[in-house]
Structures are given as C-alpha cells and as structure tokens.
C-alpha cells in the first residue's frame, strides 16, 4: 500500500499543516517522513529560482520516497511525499489544496504563517486526498 504525506511549510520553514493518506501510518515512520521533508526544503528553494511555475514536480528522491513540491506566490511550500508517480493526480491535488489555502488566507481570524487548525480545512484536504490517492 502506498502512503502519501502532505505538508504545508511556512516562509520560515515552520510546519503549518500535515496529513497522511491513508491515516494508518505508524508513528515511527512519521518521524522519518518529516525528516525527509525537512531535508528537501533547501532543494525546493533552489528550484523556486529556476522555474516560473508554482508546481515544481518531483524535486528529490530518498530510497523509494519521491518528493513533489508546489510553492505559492507568498513562498509557502506544499510538499507531498509519495511512492507512486502520477503527475496529473499530484498536480490536481496541489491546485485544489492551493484553492483551499487561499480561502484560509481570506479568513480574518487566521494569522498568516501560523499553523492551520481549521477542522473544515482538514476535512476538505482529506476529501481531496482520498479523491486523488
């Protein structure tokens, strides 16, 4: 079974949101995936300056885990750690989550670059994740 870990990383490389698909990932494996994601942040920064696209595709690999990235205009990073390569599904996932993220930014009660704690946002990301993965 393939697992997908999705993270939203803030401007100061602080985690804003994290979710795993399916939810049955062991805690030990979660820490390894967080370590892999953190290690790829410098690579994301390099790719941002080389491309005009928000979707950076697969930027790095670690063993069987591939890391795809999407960077917003405000330099918020979306990372997806995955084993299977399905570019269309990954790009569509990023675009739909980006739309949700923009709605969060429009919320007057949300502080920019702070962790996202909205249960509605979480439920919608889960729904999008099950749709594509």
Curated annotation (Swiss-Prot):
Pfam families: Sedlin_N. InterPro entries: Longin-like_dom_sf (IPR011012), Sedlin (IPR006722). Its main location: cytoplasm. GO terms for cellular component: cytoplasm; endoplasmic reticulum; Golgi apparatus; nucleus; perinuclear region of cytoplasm; TRAPP complex. It is found in: Cytoplasm, Perinuclear region; Endoplasmic reticulum; Golgi apparatus. The keyword Lipid metabolism does not apply. GO terms for biological process: endoplasmic reticulum to Golgi vesicle-mediated transport. Keywords: Cytoplasm, Endoplasmic reticulum, ER-Golgi transport, Golgi apparatus, Transport. Part of the multisubunit TRAPP (transport protein particle) complex. May play a role in vesicular transport from endoplasmic reticulum to Golgi. Belongs to the TRAPP small subunits family. Sedlin subfamily. This is Trafficking protein particle complex subunit 2. It comes from Dictyostelium discoideum. The lineage of its organism: Eukaryota, Amoebozoa, Evosea, Eumycetozoa, Dictyostelia.
